[in-house]
């Protein structure tokens, strides 16, 4: 069994909803201790359908709480359309485990068709997605993880959930993102 304190420090990233006409999107990172104490909320702009969300995530993680953060949670591998977070690069640059949490198993065939239809660099994006571990069912969610083992992932998710099936840091980042809808 992996021993972990209840107030394990984690950060969870999600994006705010966006419109088709938007050129930039908003990334939200919520830094928490366990499942109850919020110690920071961070924002970055990134390009819709670009390839810069990875550097924005790394930038936030390396900011104020770098030494305290034990785990990076992502609400999926794509942000702002098809801006793909490179799990390997985030793990390498931050030296932190990266855990992706999603509700449903992704339809890769549909994703790859969309990439091929709209992106000149579709092959590069598809190669990146295929390099990631396959999503794995864990209770009622799917997870992908880099830099950690299954037992660690189960334990940290358990410690960081409250009443939802996902870690609180992701739930709060999502709620904050939804709040941006009123600004449009």
UniProtKB/Swiss-Prot annotation:
It holds the Pfam family DUF99. It comes from the Archaea. HAMAP family: UPF0215. Belongs to the UPF0215 family. This is UPF0215 protein MJ1150. The lineage of its organism: Archaea, Methanobacteriati, Methanobacteriota, Methanomada group, Methanococci.
């Amino acid at each position: 069994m992996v021993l972990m304190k209840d107030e394990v420090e984690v950060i969870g990233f999600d994006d705010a909803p966006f419109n088709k006409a938007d050129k930039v999107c908003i990334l939200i990172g919520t830094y928490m201790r366990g499942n109850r104490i919020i110690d920071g909320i961070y924002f970055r702009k990134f390009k819709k359908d670009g390839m810069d969300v990875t550097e924005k995530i790394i930038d936030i993680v390396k900011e104020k709480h770098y030494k305290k953060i034990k785990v990076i949670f992502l609400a999926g591998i794509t942000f702002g359309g098809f801006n793909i977070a490179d799990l390997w690069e985030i793990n390498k640059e931050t030296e932190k485990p990266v855990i992706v949490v999603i509700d449903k198993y992704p339809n890769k065939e549909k994703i790859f068709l969309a990439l091929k239809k709209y992106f000149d660099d579709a092959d590069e994006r598809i190669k990146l997605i295929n390099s990631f571990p396959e999503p794995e069912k864990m209770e009622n969610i799917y997870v992908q993880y880099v830099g950690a083992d299954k037992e660690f992932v189960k334990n940290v998710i358990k410690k960081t959930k409250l009443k939802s099936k996902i870690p609180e840091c992701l739930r709060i980042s999502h709620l904050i993102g939804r709040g941006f809808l009123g600004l449009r």
